[in-house]
């Protein structure tokens, strides 16, 4: 058996999220597994670093699967890209140790949220939009306070996997890039809809709809803190997944 790792990029707009679902619902995992099974002539089960929600995109999703096939790595990637819809692409095929797992071996995940200050017919598919002017320095000052270990339950949807609501954030901040306001955050793990919840809260404060003190109350998991409406899924990208050095990959072949 071989353990194969791939990097995946996708436009999440037409999909009901990453995770495979019954009843013919179209998901990114479902599309990838169907194409891989066809290429390798065996059933394939993918593990992924992040289970993105409906409409969320990825530039650096990482997956792995085990196979008995001896098909060369570049052939697998090329065949996948020929069969997959235009909204999904794979690259960086690597053979890794059998104990590597895309989700459980990851040390850090990074997300970026792209936000427009004016509506766009072209970029609206890949960015959120604010209906009011935003105080970017204030939003950045709030983002900086996320660094460290916090309970993010106030910013997320119900946790169903039993792993708790504490996350360790290495960095977070806002910046301007080519006409977009961009929120960048790196952490060991993320709760469901957590990044969109954080962005939604900071947008409300940056637009003057919420007092900045309410952000600290939410971060302190105050039972009386207001839960915010999450930002639109269209602006969120899983941008990178980081693994420890001891999961070095063999050369492509």
Swiss-Prot record:
Which UniProt keyword terms apply here? Isomerase, tRNA processing
Pfam families on file? PseudoU_synth_1
InterPro entries assigned = PsdUridine_synth_cat_dom_sf, PsdUridine_synth_TruA, PsdUridine_synth_TruA_a/b_dom, PsdUridine_synth_TruA_C, TruA/RsuA/RluB/E/F_N
> What GO terms in the biological process aspect are recorded for it?
tRNA pseudouridine synthesis
Catalytically driven reaction(s): uridine(38/39/40) in tRNA = pseudouridine(38/39/40) in tRNA
* Active site (UniProt): 53 (nucleophile)
Entry's family note = Belongs to the tRNA pseudouridine synthase TruA family.
According to the record's subunit comment, the protein's assembly and interactions are:
Homodimer.
The job of this chain, per UniProt, is described as: Formation of pseudouridine at positions 38, 39 and 40 in the anticodon stem and loop of transfer RNAs.
Q: What is this protein called?
A: tRNA pseudouridine synthase A
Q: Which organism is it from?
A: Chlorobium luteolum (strain DSM 273 / BCRC 81028 / 2530) (Pelodictyon luteolum)
